[in-house]
UniProtKB/Swiss-Prot annotation:
Protein name: Nicotinate-nucleotide--dimethylbenzimidazole phosphoribosyltransferase
Keywords, comma-separated and alphabetical: Cobalamin biosynthesis, Glycosyltransferase, Transferase
Pathway: Nucleoside biosynthesis; alpha-ribazole biosynthesis; alpha-ribazole from 5,6-dimethylbenzimidazole: step 1/2
Source organism: Chromobacterium violaceum (strain ATCC 12472 / DSM 30191 / JCM 1249 / CCUG 213 / NBRC 12614 / NCIMB 9131 / NCTC 9757 / MK)
EC code(s) of this entry: 2.4.2.21
Length: 344
């Protein structure tokens, strides 16, 4: 299994020492200061390199949609993958604005997207209905994890030093809610939200599906991998693999919202040291995301009321991180500027 690369604590300490002598009152840049120091630890440099983000969107369908859990039909997954390929989705606009590498990976789209200029790593055409049976077999789960690992390797080989995973899959908030409930012990009423905007009847269907799925595995002693197979989805497993491989290679991941956090929880059961390589981007408007973040011991940078997925919330936060690094590297020290430091 994966083993996360150790942090370079000497580089982090050197970065903190630099922060202490920059021309500003100590701590006056707030979280931006420690963010820069975290990148120092991740990169092994007291003055980290500018950030080169890579965004990978994993797409798959979910059998649980037959339970009436989504406001949109499953065909939307295929249609949105076409939209990604054509550059018309929100994450495409954000990637262009950030000059970020963007890759779309089909790990389980039910429709035919074989002619599109994306990465084709389809494990199967959608997961099974998790309310009635295991969403994936153990072999399918491992194949999806490996698709995510391979995507992380491609991104890093292309020069990325910051990873963002996005998701596309009608029904995936239901799978994510089931995972978060199982892994945290939280009640479905606290975790299951409206996702793509279901009405009250749809919300009741989602809660019923999650409760049925949880009851199906209630007496089983499941490992993290088993839980992912029983209650997850192909793109969720791929995102987990993406995070794990990034950490093994020494590249941090900026975690998006509800689905990405469910994947991170699963990945953390596989490698607890993964925590050191994750950074939460935003607090989603989706019910239960706060519970997932608490379980991950991650603190989001912003709360903009977003709940789109695709990696969009994480992408919006990339400029904050880029500015944190630029401030750290570009500001003068008191000695360099000829400015008097704090009086003894």
């Amino acid at each position: 299994m994966n083993s996360s690369k150790p942090l370079d604590l000497s580089a982090r300490n050197a970065a903190r020492a630099r922060q202490a002598v920059l021309t500003k009152p100590p701590g006056s840049l707030g979280q931006l200061e420690e963010l820069a120091c975290r990148f120092a630890a991740w990169q092994g440099r007291a003055q980290p390199e500018d950030l080169r983000p890579a965004i990978t969107v994993f797409a798959a369908d979910h059998g649980v949609t037959v339970e009436g859990v989504s406001a949109f039909p499953s065909a939307v997954t295929t249609e949105m993958v076409r939209n990604f390929a054509n550059g018309g989705a929100a994450i495409c606009v954000l990637a262009r604005a950030l000059d970020a590498r963007l890759e779309v990976v089909d790990v389980g789209v039910a429709g035919d997207v074989s002619a599109l200029p994306i990465v084709h790593a389809k494990v199967r055409p959608g997961s099974h209905n998790l309310a009635r049976q295991a969403a994936m077999s153990a072999e399918e789960t491992e194949a999806a994890l490996e698709a995510g690992r391979a995507a992380a390797r491609r991104a890093v080989e292309a020069g990325a030093n910051l990873l963002v995973a996005g998701d596309m899959g009608i029904g995936n908030t239901t799978a994510s809610a089931a995972l978060i409930c199982r892994l945290t012990g939280a009640a479905p009423e606290l975790v299951v939200g409206r996702g793509t905007g279901v009405d009250d009847a749809g919300l009741a269907n989602k809660r019923r599906a999650v409760k049925t799925a949880l009851a199906r595995v209630a007496w089983e002693n499941l490992s993290g991998l088993d839980t992912l197979s029983e209650l997850g989805g192909l793109e969720i497993a791929a995102i987990a693999g993406f995070y794990l491989e990034g950490a093994r290679l020494g590249v941090p991941s900026l975690v998006d919202g509800f689905i990405a956090s469910a994947a991170a929880l699963c990945a953390k059961t596989i490698d607890p040291s993964l925590h050191d390589w994750l950074l939460a981007s935003h607090r989603s408007a989706e019910s239960g995301h706060e519970l997932a973040l608490t379980a991950l011991q991650l603190h989001p940078l912003v709360d903009l009321g977003m709940r789109l997925g695709e990696g969009s919330g994480a992408a919006v936060c990339v400029p904050l991180l880029q500015l944190a690094v630029k401030l750290h590297n570009g500001m003068a020290t008191f000695d360099e500027a000829g400015v008097s430091g704090k009086s003894a």
